[in-house]
């Protein structure tokens, strides 16, 4: 079991073919990953989530839950999208987000201009 709590070790573990990854703070990691990748382009969000959460070497491909995600950027604009993901109950630890969950991700910039985010599961 590889435990990770930020983006760099997560990506390294995925690239190294780790089969069993536990994310210690899944909601904030997911939010930061999404915030970072999508700033103002919702197609990037979709692509990114599919790559990270749908990664074949990490995630069990049996069920394909649908997650509804709303992203609020710093201008208050909300994107809503439906994303089909391949998920198992433990992969990445992010995945107690169950079928048809609505996740609201708020994207903000901190005082240094870095994107941050938080996830609210509704």
Residue ranges and their predicted role:
Residues 40-83:
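Long intrinsically disordered, low-complexity regions that are acidic and Ser/Thr-rich
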Residues 61-79, 91-122:
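Membrane-engaging insertion elements
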